[in-house]
């Protein structure tokens, strides 16, 4: 993968980058999580209204359409949408986009290297917590990274029918993951806290990764509930059987997890398994349920 050269950041941009390294990421995130859970009545409703106006949140598509319907900011932030607000592409060979947001990057995994943003790449091994067997499954495959901004719907859904086989919690940094920082913080997604979910599908293995960030107070899944806090200090691996009472089977378009405040989702596909939609480019807005690509069966 050949990378182009880009202009050096300005002094103002360098200061912004330096602040990310110096600020107390964990304490800010813990404080944001505590505040987001407060139930302060009219104060909470005022904050939600200000936030919705600033970020142009479309509450009309949510099940609860008024700020006063939400007891806490977190309840507002992970608001469910009305039924059919996000139609799921029903073509059996179609993959669906997992989240609302914007494409950060996408394309081919060059041997074991993914493009983070212009001028930066990172390896499968570091992203996947040095699980070499897992990384080998996706060499020369495809990937897509979706950035969820504060205005977006923050539940994450399945691109296809799948069975959960492994979940890996990886402790890490809590850098912001906005497009500017993605361009200037090396190995951003491979150094941030993240939750790696490996699934078995009709076309082979698939990975969906929830990446934490500054003030992303918690991540959750539909099968295990809230993963953090508390934040473990070591990598934790959970294996799942494909059959039996504890098996986790999810349908295309079904919810699989959520962020309490925004972050990023990364999907990995094996070599030759899928073709990503040609119109999808970095910066392209995404809506959950729309077509991500075609399964090669």
Swiss-Prot record:
Alphabetized, the UniProt keywords read:
Cell membrane, Decarboxylase, Lipid biosynthesis, Lipid metabolism, Lyase, Membrane, Phospholipid biosynthesis, Phospholipid metabolism, Pyruvate, Zymogen
UniProt catalytic activity? a 1,2-diacyl-sn-glycero-3-phospho-L-serine + H(+) = a 1,2-diacyl-sn-glycero-3-phosphoethanolamine + CO2
Q: Which residue positions does UniProt flag as site: Cleavage (non-hydrolytic)?
A: 262-263
Coarse class of the primary localization is membrane
Pathway(s) of this molecule: Phospholipid metabolism; phosphatidylethanolamine biosynthesis; phosphatidylethanolamine from CDP-diacylglycerol: step 2/2
Modified positions (Pyruvic acid (Ser)) are 263
How this chain sits in the membrane, per its record, is: Peripheral membrane protein
* Record: active site: 100 (charge relay system), 157 (charge relay system), 263 (charge relay system), 263 (schiff-base intermediate with substrate)
One example GO MF annotation: phosphatidylserine decarboxylase activity
Compartmental location? Cell membrane
Q: How is the cofactor bound?
A: Binds 1 pyruvoyl group covalently per subunit.
* Purpose: Catalyzes the formation of phosphatidylethanolamine (PtdEtn) from phosphatidylserine (PtdSer).
The protein's name: Phosphatidylserine decarboxylase proenzyme
Organism encoding this protein: Glaesserella parasuis serovar 5 (strain SH0165) (Haemophilus parasuis)
Provide the organism lineage as a comma list.
Bacteria, Pseudomonadati, Pseudomonadota, Gammaproteobacteria, Pasteurellales
């Amino acid at each position: 993968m050949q990378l182009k050269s880009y202009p050096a950041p300005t002094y103002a941009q360098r200061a912004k980058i330096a602040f990310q390294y110096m600020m107390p990421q964990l304490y800010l995130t813990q404080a944001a999580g505590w505040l987001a859970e407060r139930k302060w009545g009219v104060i909470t409703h005022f904050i939600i209204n200000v936030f919705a106006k600033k970020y142009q949140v479309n509450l009309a598509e949510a099940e609860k359409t008024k700020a006063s319907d939400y007891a806490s900011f977190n309840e507002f932030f992970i608001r469910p949408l009305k039924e059919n607000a996000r139609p799921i592409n029903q073509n059996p060979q179609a993959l669906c986009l997992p989240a609302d947001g914007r494409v950060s990057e996408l394309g081919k995994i060059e041997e074991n290297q993914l493009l983070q943003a212009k001028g930066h790449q990172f390896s499968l091994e570091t992203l996947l917590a040095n699980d070499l067997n897992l990384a080998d499954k996706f060499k020369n495959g495809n990937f897509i990274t979706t950035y969820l901004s504060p205005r977006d719907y923050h539940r994450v859904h399945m691109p296809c029918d799948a069975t959960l086989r492994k979940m890996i919690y990886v402790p890490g940094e809590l850098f912001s993951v906005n497009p500017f920082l993605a361009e200037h913080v090396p190995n951003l997604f491979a150094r941030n806290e993240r939750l790696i979910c490996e699934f078995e599908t009709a076309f082979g293995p698939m990975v969906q990764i929830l990446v934490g960030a500054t003030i992303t107070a918690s991540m959750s899944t539909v099968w295990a509930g809230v993963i953090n806090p508390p934040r473990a200090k070591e990598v934790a691996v959970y294996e799942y059987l494909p059959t039996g009472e504890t098996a986790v089977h999810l349908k295309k378009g079904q919810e699989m997890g959520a962020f309490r405040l925004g972050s990023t989702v990364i999907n990995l596909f094996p070599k030759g398994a899928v073709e990503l939609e040609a119109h999808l480019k970095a910066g392209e807005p995404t809506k959950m349920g729309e077509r991500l690509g075609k399964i090669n069966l």
